[in-house]
Amino acid sequence: MASPGAGRAPPELPERNCGYREVEYWDQRYQGAADSAPYDWFGDFSSFRALLEPELRPEDRILVLGCGNSALSYELFLGGFPNVTSVDYSSVVVAAMQARHAHVPQLRWETMDVRKLDFPSASFDVVLEKGTLDALLAGERDPWTVSSEGVHTVDQVLSEVSRVLVPGGRFISMTSAAPHFRTRHYAQAYYGWSLRHATYGSGFHFHLYLMHKGGKLSVAQLALGAQILSPPRPPTSPCFLQDSDHEDFLSAIQL
């Protein structure tokens, strides 16, 4: 896959990559989203379905973080997983998705900040995110040394994911970030989960991380997690990313 999106050409981009973290950008981007084609980061459902479906049961309560105008929630419904709640902090896109899928009342759409979820603890069996963490980290300049702000932001999200998952629940994260960059974020013992990694896609490979609530991290994973505030020296001089004029940069940002 040549680009991170599927379904249509990328819309207008923010002036700087850090704009991907701002709700104002997304509100503007999603004007008219109810009538536009879906846009999926890092592949559509068919590209990772074989990895995802073994982790899902028809009765699962599924939460999709940062849904945007992706087709994922609707495709889960069509695939036999009807209990899907999707959240995004852009009220514009939430309203658009409610309008687009008004014929499917089982699907729920809510405006919410993924760093502070308004759900009771242990209320979901599965939490999915695809590209949401990547967007929150898009302003980082050096993939080897994530800022303390970036580390804290990701920790806020992951802590909330762990909180809303039931014992035995699954968190599935799809991203462009390779294990040597992303594992250290997920591999914190206090989240209370195990961690596995797989790749998907043809040509350019994306990464799928599977966490089981109640499992344990390996010694090697815990060692990586311990590096989050004191990362190892990179093998070459740090690459300071320049703002890109297209959204392929998210496939290379590797945070």
Curated annotation (Swiss-Prot):
UniProt xrefs under SUPFAM superfamilies: S-adenosyl-L-methionine-dependent methyltransferases (SSF53335)
Which terms are listed as keywords in the entry? Methyltransferase, Phosphoprotein, S-adenosyl-L-methionine, Transferase
Q: Where is this motif: Required for methyltransferase activity?
A: 129-134
One Pfam entry name = Methyltransf_11
Instruction: Write out the GO biological process terms.
Output: methylation
Q: Which reaction does it catalyse?
A: L-lysyl-[protein] + S-adenosyl-L-methionine = N(6)-methyl-L-lysyl-[protein] + S-adenosyl-L-homocysteine + H(+); N(6)-methyl-L-lysyl-[protein] + S-adenosyl-L-methionine = N(6),N(6)-dimethyl-L-lysyl-[protein] + S-adenosyl-L-homocysteine + H(+); N(6),N(6)-dimethyl-L-lysyl-[protein] + S-adenosyl-L-methionine = N(6),N(6),N(6)-trimethyl-L-lysyl-[protein] + S-adenosyl-L-homocysteine + H(+)
Q: Which residues carry this modification: Phosphotyrosine?
A: 39
> Which InterPro entries does the annotation name?
Lys/N-term_MeTrsfase_sf, Methyltransf_11, SAM-dependent_MTases_sf
CDD domains, per database record? AdoMet_MTases
Record has Transferase as a keyword: yes
- Which residues of the sequence carry a binding annotation for S-adenosyl-L-methionine? 26, 30, 41, 66, 88-89, 113-114, 130
Summarizing the function annotation, the protein's role is: Protein-lysine methyltransferase that efficiently catalyzes three successive methylations on 'Lys-36' in eukaryotic translation elongation factor 1 alpha (EEF1A1 or EEF1A2).
* Family to which this protein belongs: Belongs to the methyltransferase superfamily.
Q: Which PANTHER family did the record assign?
A: EEF1A LYSINE METHYLTRANSFERASE 4, SAM-DEPENDENT METHYLTRANSFERASE SUPERFAMILY PROTEIN
Q: Report the protein name in the record.
A: EEF1A lysine methyltransferase 4
**What is the name of the gene encoding this protein?**
EEF1AKMT4
